[in-house]
């Protein structure tokens, strides 16, 4: 049997990983500017943490979760999304306590798991960057969080991203709209897909989220949820829109957008771009004012989003964005003969301790092969170290582009390599 990675997973090799690290680094820097701190939650949770919060009737719970019973007969699931685990942690660790400053702003970066048909930008193990903000019902929080995602895309150089916006209103507004959907869709029940016939009974808003052709036809002219917002919900949505306009962030209203999770209320949004003539959602989120209370905490407003790293990197690649990923070595040490092995080891460590990236030959190859490795590694400087250099206590440094050489003592290299390096590469 040939052992291979499971279907829907990937190995992220070092060249690609450098791009991942760059994107993650830009995200961390951006979130820090907005006063977000990192949180790390377990990769697996009790099944109920996800099923009850995400929604028992959602596709995530009914079709896509990796769940199992452990040896203690506990029902466990690999996390399919990031918000529910963070809310669980917020409540469990009593971050709602009065001594904790509000709002509490958290971000996470990590693996999520869903049993889906693998395709470009969508894997069974995928990586998500997400943020959650607890304790503010101010519409400015909605807008600031959306603006933070918009800011991140700008910093990464992504173009052609469109903000899709909608409001699900409060509980009363949703209840009124739920009944309106039932009244509208019930006469055409038989034309809906089997899944949407079930959704019509359990959670009619899920029908709007269907990707099936027959369902899209059925909901093409459904009533708009915006017509069912009460005064409070309308005021919140109006404030969000006016603040987005004040920040010059363009948006389109998408009244059929409901998001795939049941915990949302009021503002929901998606950032969508076009890839290979198909629309692709790269970031989505919204407000979830009842979720903390649902987990046993006090009534606490919340707002957040998640974005897929694989999709983000796919879009960067499709748009031809060159990420400023650092490549190459500062120094490559060519080692001539076994007698130079110990000296090369000491010199390599001394240069590394001064903050430089260094590699050396370990294979006892001929000098020509070592110089070829230095070129492959894009080394800026090559140090040649052999028996004669060791006897003299000096090494020859060569600029790997201009081929200019200089000779310096081992003591100088070990104590002030920064000055030597700067002189060599100037």
From Swiss-Prot:
GO terms for molecular function: ATP binding; catalytic activity, acting on a protein; histidine-tRNA ligase activity; transferase activity. GO terms for cellular component: cytoplasm. Its EC number is 6.1.1.21. Keywords: Aminoacyl-tRNA synthetase, ATP-binding, Cytoplasm, Ligase, Nucleotide-binding, Protein biosynthesis. It comes from the Bacteria. One of its GO terms (biological process) is histidyl-tRNA aminoacylation. The keyword Cell membrane does not apply. CDD domains: HisRS-like_core (cd00773), HisRS_anticodon (cd00859). PROSITE patterns: AA_TRNA_LIGASE_II. It is an enzyme of class 6 (ligase). It catalyses: tRNA(His) + L-histidine + ATP = L-histidyl-tRNA(His) + AMP + diphosphate + H(+). It is found in: Cytoplasm. Homodimer. Belongs to the class-II aminoacyl-tRNA synthetase family. This is Histidine--tRNA ligase. It comes from Streptococcus equi subsp. zooepidemicus (strain MGCS10565).
